[in-house]
Amino acid sequence: MAGTSTGIYILQFDPADGSLQHAAPPGTMRNPSFVTLSPDGCTLYAVSEVDDHDDHGSGAVAALAVDRKTGALTHLNTRATGGAAPCHVSVDAGGQMVMVANYVGGSVASFRQADGALSQRVSLHRHTGRGPNAARQEQAHAHSITPGPDN
């Protein structure tokens, strides 16, 4: 993956004038591409859209504690997603499960969370198939994973 970003930037929005200001130093993470907050707002989950997090060509998902006063992020842990180029992360309504879509290879994975930190991967489901455009649809590509309203 060719991305070069090294962090997650936290900005403060001023509704009075519509301006954005840096609120905290960037959280360090290689090529973050999608983030989501836990339902209680205390943990930020972010995917690292890479294909070399481990020796198996996996991307990564990180859990970061959010300081609600300053916006600063503190790294809790990182887990391999089981597929390359994770592009989406979501949390169920109860805040217990974190789910990731891996674009390359078309897989989705789930993790439990305890106090914000991610467990080892609970499940990994690989989709198969290809699309009609062989130039860009040579394999399945997961774009997102979203839990239903009743989890």
Residue ranges and their predicted role:
Residues 1-2, 46-47, 100:
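Residue position within the beta-strands of beta-propeller blades
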Residues 1-11:
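An edge-strand/N-cap motif at the start of beta-rich repeat modules
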Residues 4, 30-33, 85-87, 141:
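Beta-rich catalytic cores
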Residues 8, 52-54, 59-61, 106-109:
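Structural signal for beta-propeller blades
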Residues 11-18, 64-71, 110-119:
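Short loop/turn segments immediately following beta-strands, especially the blade-tip
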Residues 25-36, 44-48:
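Glycine/small-residue-rich interface belts in oligomeric ring/scaffold proteins
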Residues 39-41, 91-95, 149-150:
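Residue-level detector of Asp-centered blade-edge/turn motifs that repeat once per structural unit
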Residues 72-144:
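Asp-box/WD-like beta-propeller blade repeats and closely related beta-sheet repeat scaffolds
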